[in-house]
Amino acid sequence: MTFSVDKVRADFPVLSREVNGLPLAYLDSAASAQKPSQVIDAEAEFYRHGYAAVHRGIHTLSAQATEKMENVRKRASLFINARSAEELVFVRGTTEGINLVANSWGNSNVRAGDNIIISQMEHHANIVPWQMLCARVGAELRVIPLNPDGTLQLETLPTLFDEKTRLLAITHVSNVLGTENPLAEMITLAHQHGAKVLVDGAQAVMHHPVDVQALDCDFYVFSVHKLYGPTGIGILYVKEALLQEMPPWEGGGSMIATVSLSEGTTWTKAPWRFEAGTPNTGGIIGLGAALEYVSALGLNNIAEYEQNLMHYALSQLESVPDLTLYGPQNRLGVIAFNLGKHHAYDVGSFLDNYGIAVRTGHHCAMPLMAYYNVPAMCRASLAMYNTHEEVDRLVTGLQRIHRLLG
């Protein structure tokens, strides 16, 4: 099908509103994407006419809700080309998924003297859980350094691996720089050293197809709210043999086989033993609707449109005086920048006055900010519903701020 940004925009109610008397230009989808009516309606319809607690219920509503939930798991497995739906765990988001791996697989497999490798461009969600794990067990955290252009110093990677390396935890796409890391070669190198690989896919799955079998990663995790779905729901993919070996992290209902005060508790099989308690079933229904929506548009069509828009944006931003861009020329989704010596918060506030929504701050990537020696950056993110006109408004807004502030 032919991609039409006008038709896409018509599906997103919020894009028709005004901010400060001007049409909203929402350039903050990397933080959280807006939701199409199809997702909003699917979740609302479930709560209106189909809601019930899933699992173990013999009545019709419960059985139907359980079936819908498991059908979404199957749809999500197809979306990332997992071998089986039983390789997917429903989590609250990327952060919980990484913490689950750190506390389940990590506690069982990382020992004193071992090491874990991350990079200098990671989101805090892919740093802090590993710092906590290393502190608990006495392991070492090693870091792949950045280059000034926002790529990783991959030539250093072979020197970081040794026989004690247990895990490479790496972002697919940087949430600040838009850098897409060369996962295939990184994963191959890690496996050659006997290490597992976790990929933070939070900033990748909305921009192009992801094939976890082709990548051969051991763990892949992403949030749905950045993929035009609801908040509070995400997917953790784990290779099936690995997942079945992992102990549960949280205890409670739904994740048990038997509970006895005298003989202890036994667990149900994965993935359900990692889904303690009543799940966010409405969010899961919304997840299914979001996957259906982007799949109907075609991720390859989305990728082509977004890349053309990104190239246009980068070329137009060259006209803004004193603008510093961070990250490589070839990037996905985001453009981080600072204007002269003005604080990112000030620039972001002026842009908001012009109806333009960008993200400002350290973007949960303080080590990256420290590398560039700045306290904060502005970040404009481009999604499938953004337009060339909105890019022009961003450029004009920055030019106007430069004239006002000098």
Swiss-Prot record:
UniProt superkingdom: Bacteria
EC numbers, comma separated: 2.8.1.7, 4.4.1.16
Pathway: Cofactor biosynthesis; iron-sulfur cluster biosynthesis
Keywords: Cytoplasm, Lyase, Pyridoxal phosphate, Transferase
Keyword Cytoplasm among UniProt keywords: yes
Gene3D superfamilies recorded: Aspartate Aminotransferase, domain 1, Type I PLP-dependent aspartate aminotransferase-like (Major domain)
Reaction equations catalysed: (sulfur carrier)-H + L-cysteine = (sulfur carrier)-SH + L-alanine; L-selenocysteine + AH2 = hydrogenselenide + L-alanine + A + H(+)
GO CC, alphabetical: cytoplasm
InterPro entries in the record: Aminotrans_V_dom, Cys_dSase_SufS, PyrdxlP-dep_Trfase, PyrdxlP-dep_Trfase_major, PyrdxlP-dep_Trfase_small
Record-linked Pfam families: Aminotran_5
Subcellular location field: Cytoplasm
Modified residues (N6-(pyridoxal phosphate)lysine): 226
Cofactor(s) this protein requires: pyridoxal 5'-phosphate
Lyase found in the keyword field: yes
Major localization class: cytoplasm
Function: Cysteine desulfurases mobilize the sulfur from L-cysteine to yield L-alanine, an essential step in sulfur metabolism for biosynthesis of a variety of sulfur-containing biomolecules. Component of the suf operon, which is activated and required under specific conditions such as oxidative stress and iron limitation. Acts as a potent selenocysteine lyase in vitro, that mobilizes selenium from L-selenocysteine. Selenocysteine lyase activity is however unsure in vivo.
Subunit-structure text: Homodimer. Interacts with SufE and the SufBCD complex composed of SufB, SufC and SufD. The interaction with SufE is required to mediate the direct transfer of the sulfur atom from the S-sulfanylcysteine.
Family, per entry: Belongs to the class-V pyridoxal-phosphate-dependent aminotransferase family. Csd subfamily.
Protein name: Cysteine desulfurase
Organism: Escherichia coli O6:K15:H31 (strain 536 / UPEC)
